[in-house]
A protein has these predicted regions:
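Conserved catalytic core of the tyrosine transesterase superfamily
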Residues: 1-300
Length: 300
């Protein structure tokens, strides 16, 4: 089946993450369903730009966000490029498809006061869950890693001697991120509590190569649990409507930039392939400068 061959291509050649592959598969299944229900077309190769446009219009009419629609366009572009590569298409139907423009929104981030309150005033508790949750939040803010990257960290990815963490990013790109003494102390505290937690022995696979973050049953945490943990604690210190792990990634980058870090260094730490992706954080800094200017300049 063509879709299966495409998924294999993403998995073994492009080496996309499981999360990305599931999203691409879901997009293709959704488009296939649309073609069948609306036009009685089963073969994706029989599609053309007019059918694709009609699907995109229907998505927007169903109140899908522009960002969501653009991701689905990316899926179809990737799929039909694959079909071209396989010699299955004479003309790529995506050539005449234009993605809707996304209104640029500045990244949401927490203030220094928010962060101080989170780590100095919030009571995480002294047990396994509390130490784990605090370390999860600490790592997000201290390293700027993505949620998928965090859940996949193994204990042997951490080198406490050199103060570094090895992270496997998008498309399996590996990078090394430095960590400071405070983070190392939190890691040591969590590992000590985890090793002394008798409930951990429920999972016979737990050893030196295991996933760093586990549940109280000794199972690896999943992205959904990590999201709920972060949202729970950020809701205690911020009234923002956006309280996801990515907010802590934005906060890491913004605070680094505000405190004088080189933007190229931030790019490497975040695992961005392009500097353009990192430069969005400079807009927050510019807005901050504008505020200071208006407050301080006599003719502002």
């Amino acid at each position: 089946m063509l879709k299966d061959k495409y998924i294999d291509y993403l998995t073994f050649e492009k080496r996309y993450s499981t999360h990305t592959i599931l999203a691409y598969r879901a997009d293709l299944d959704e488009y296939s369903g649309f073609l069948q229900s609306q036009y009685n077309i089963i073969d994706l190769l029989q599609s053309d730009h007019t059918l694709i446009r009609s699907w995109l219009i229907s998505l927007l009419e169903l109140k899908n966000s522009t960002r969501s629609v653009n991701r689905k366009i990316s899926t179809l572009k990737s799929f039909y490029r694959f079909c071209e590569k396989m010699g299955l298409l004479e003309t790529n139907p995506m050539i005449k498809v234009v993605a809707p423009q996304i209104s640029k929104q500045l990244p949401v981030f927490l203030t220094h006061n928010n962060i101080d309150t989170l780590f100095q005033s919030v009571d995480f508790g002294s047990g396994l869950k509390g130490s784990r949750d605090k370390l999860i939040l600490t790592l997000f803010y201290a390293t700027g890693i993505r949620r998928e990257e965090l859940v996949n960290i193994k204990t042997n990815d951490i080198d406490l001697t050199t103060g570094t963490i090895k992270v496997l990013g998008k498309r399996n790109k590996e990078r090394i991120i430095p960590i400071g003494p405070k983070v190392i102390a939190e890691i040591n505290n969590y590992l000590l509590i985890r090793s002394n937690s008798t409930i951990i022995v429920e999972d016979a696979n737990l050893n030196n190569n295991t996933t760093l973050f586990v549940t109280t049953r000794g199972l690896p945490v999943n992205p959904k649990l990590v999201y709920s943990i972060v949202h729970k604690y950020l809701a205690l210190i911020s009234s923002s409507s956006k309280l996801s792990p990515h907010v802590l990634r934005h906060t890491f980058a913004t605070h680094m930039l505000d405190d004088g870090a080189d933007i190229n260094a931030i790019k490497e730490l975040l695992g961005h392939s392009s500097l353009a992706a990192t430069q969005v954080y400079t807009h927050n800094t510019i807005e901050k400068l504008k505020t200071i200017y208006k407050q301080a300049h006599p003719r502002a």
